[in-house]
């Protein structure tokens, strides 16, 4: 299992202040940036389909069979995941990365809840609806792990379209037998027993968005040993995990993210990813909301590595081998540096 790429080392770094930056004031060159694209050669081989496209017909099927197959399989999944190991709330870049990391252990059952029909969050595009995805080094090592190509620059890499990352990690993740994505499903609330988060309250997303117009639409539940909240920054449906913790008195305040500072923000997001209350780990831009870290803008490395760290923290909380406390056994990539979680730097919310 690969360790986590980040800008911090677990064993050899001195403690940093809350929002220390890794940027050292290097001058920005006025010269045009070389795109540096390498020429690629493609070979196209003609293949013959195993059917006649001019006289194609499908095998017959009864409409009721289609209905039964969809219903039976979905209901089986709902029964199976009514009590699970980990629930990841939010399938953006951080949530998908967390689920990917956790599910490397085939014995851990992972449910992903995403209120949108289309998972991926903001990772289908770069900034301002542009296509390219910018990832600062050394987070590109995660792209190497999942097999996403990029154009390499000195301190960062560029994926030609953000959708390449999202579609790749999603296809790898959903192919794993211990993962189930429940999209178009909203997490309306948390299950809390004593002082520990023990799962989420769920409903169809369209129902959750229309409680003001309809009545008698009670929810469902999904119990979990660990909840990973990756609900993004504040907005109509953002940062819902930490906002709910505040409203029920489990944390004191949610100051909200500060103005944009990429060099400070990305290090802080990874460093401050943690289990904020027993049973609930916060990752991605939701970390900025609870800690008042700066927003990072259209760079995605911290989302990936924060998600990886959250995944390893979840494994640790489950008492399983993980990269946080060094109990991971296997073929670790020596060039990957673990994102340290210095308890002295944990901020009281």
UniProtKB/Swiss-Prot annotation:
GO terms for biological process: DNA damage response; oxazole or thiazole biosynthetic process; response to cold; thiamine biosynthetic process; thiazole biosynthetic process. The gene is THI1. Keywords: Cell membrane, Chloroplast, Iron, Membrane, Metal-binding, Mitochondrion, NAD, Plastid, Thiamine biosynthesis, Transferase, Transit peptide. Its cofactor is Fe cation. It catalyses: [ADP-thiazole synthase]-L-cysteine + glycine + NAD(+) = [ADP-thiazole synthase]-dehydroalanine + ADP-5-ethyl-4-methylthiazole-2-carboxylate + nicotinamide + 3 H2O + 2 H(+). Its EC number is 2.4.2.60. Gene3D superfamilies: 6.10.250.2840, FAD/NAD(P)-binding domain. This is Thiamine thiazole synthase, chloroplastic. HAMAP family: THI4.
């Amino acid at each position: 299992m690969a360790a986590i790429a980040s800008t911090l080392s677990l064993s050899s770094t001195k403690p940093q202040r809350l929002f220390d930056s890794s940027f050292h004031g290097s001058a920005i060159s006025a010269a045009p940036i070389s795109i540096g694209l390498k020429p690629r050669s493609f070979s196209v081989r003609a293949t013959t389909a195993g059917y006649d496209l001019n006289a194609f017909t499908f095998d017959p099927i009864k409409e009721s069979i289609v209905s039964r197959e969809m219903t039976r399989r979905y209901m089986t999944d709902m029964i199976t995941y009514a009590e699970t190991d980990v629930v990841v709330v939010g399938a953006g870049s951080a949530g998908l990365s967390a689920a990917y990391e956790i599910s490397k252990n085939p014995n851990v059952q992972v449910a992903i809840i995403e209120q949108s029909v289309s998972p991926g969050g903001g990772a289908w595009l770069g900034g301002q609806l542009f296509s390219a995805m910018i990832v600062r080094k050394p987070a590109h090592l995660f792209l190497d792990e999942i097999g996403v190509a990029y154009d390499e620059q000195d301190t960062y890499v560029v994926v030609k379209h953000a959708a390449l990352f999202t579609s790749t990690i999603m296809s790898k993740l959903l192919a794993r037998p211990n993962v189930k994505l429940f999209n178009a499903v909203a997490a309306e609330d948390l299950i809390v027993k004593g002082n520990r988060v023990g799962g989420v309250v769920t409903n169809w997303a369209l129902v959750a968005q229309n409680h003001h117009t309809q009545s008698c639409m009670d929810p469902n539940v999904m119990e979990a040993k660990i909840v990973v909240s990756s609900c993004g920054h504040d907005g109509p449906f953002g940062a819902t995990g930490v906002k709910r913790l505040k409203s029920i008195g489990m944390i004191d305040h949610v100051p909200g993210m500060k103005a944009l500072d990429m060099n400070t923000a990305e290090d802080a997001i990874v460093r401050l990813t943690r289990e904020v209350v027993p049973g609930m780990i916060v990752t991605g831009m939701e970390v900025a909301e609870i800690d008042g870290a700066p927003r990072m803008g259209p760079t995605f490395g911290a989302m990936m590595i924060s998600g990886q760290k959250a995944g390893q923290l979840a494994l640790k909380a489950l008492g399983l081998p993980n990269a946080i406390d060094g109990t991971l056994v296997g073929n670790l990539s020596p060039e990957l540096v673990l994102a340290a979680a210095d308890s002295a730097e944990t901020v009281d919310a």
